[in-house]
Amino acid sequence: MLHGRTVRSTIPRGEITKVRLGFNRDGFTVADWRDVPGRNTIALIELDQPCLAERDVRHFAEPILLLAHADRDRLLEAEVSIAYRPAEPVYDPERSPHCFKEIVIEKGNVARGLEGADLVVEGEYRVGHQEQLYIETNGVIAVPENGGVTVYGSLQCPYYVQRALTVLLALPPEKVRVVQAETGGGFGGKEEYPSMIAGHACLLALKSGRPVKIVYDRVEDMIATTKRHPGVIRHSTGVRRDGRLTAIEIDVLLDGGAYMTLSPVVLSKIGRAHV
């Protein structure tokens, strides 16, 4: 079995200009976006997120290159230098020109309800990223077999992973087997992200012809995987002196980051919860 490693961007936004391998490649398997047999994307709601960056970097720690070796120490010691042409990142969702999804839920006449209130209470609330901090970090084993691949992993949604791999690897569903191992916590953090780490392990496994294991340490898991969304929530609530509510207007803005992932699903759940 080989150990796998993901080489990631060190800038939040820019263009990759050069990748240099500073190690003896003997015994190594190296893969980049050109080794993807299917579509270089993580298939989910939209096909906007690459499995491996081709040229553009859109967030810090974006996957660029994959390495595998039988000796884990040699794997971790392998030096890779990447040159970039940096660009200005956008960190504030209120400044972003791009909207992944807008959901409107209307019931009754909100404007009239607020006008008929004795008092309108307004508030703005900001929440930051939340790390799920599951006990077991993300990890998978990919085994090439029978003209396809079997993946064993710590994950929540095996059918998400299977669909993503059929698109990435250009394989029929019956050639992609995903086994959900006993999972040491997820809390949403292993809902869609395992499609990424599974894709990386599979690319290395298919190129090397050997099983490949990738297990993140805590630092990599925290900096590279998706989190609970930061957001800005604004409430306007109309109330009367007798305590009755006349109307509530709620605006929720989520920071979905560089790619859509499952942000519309999260937004829809927040909307239903407030209603």
Predicted regions: what they are:
Residues V110, L114-L169, L254-G256, S263-S268:
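Conserved beta-alpha junction segments in alpha/beta enzyme cores
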Residues V151, K175-A181, G209-V219, T246-V252:
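Beta-strand segments within the central parallel beta-sheet cores of soluble alpha/beta enzyme folds
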Residues M1-F100, V120-G123, K207, L262:
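Flexible, low-hydrophobicity surface segments
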Residues R74-V90, Y160-V161, T166, L171, ...:
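Gly/Pro-rich active-site capping loops and adjacent beta-alpha segments
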Residues E46-L75, G188-R241:
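Glycine-rich and small/hydrophobic secondary-structure elements
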Residues D26-R39, L171-V179, P211-V215:
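Glycine-rich phosphate/pyrophosphate-binding loops
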Residues V140-P144, R163-R177, H200-I214, R241:
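Proline/glycine-anchored alpha-helix kink/cap motifs
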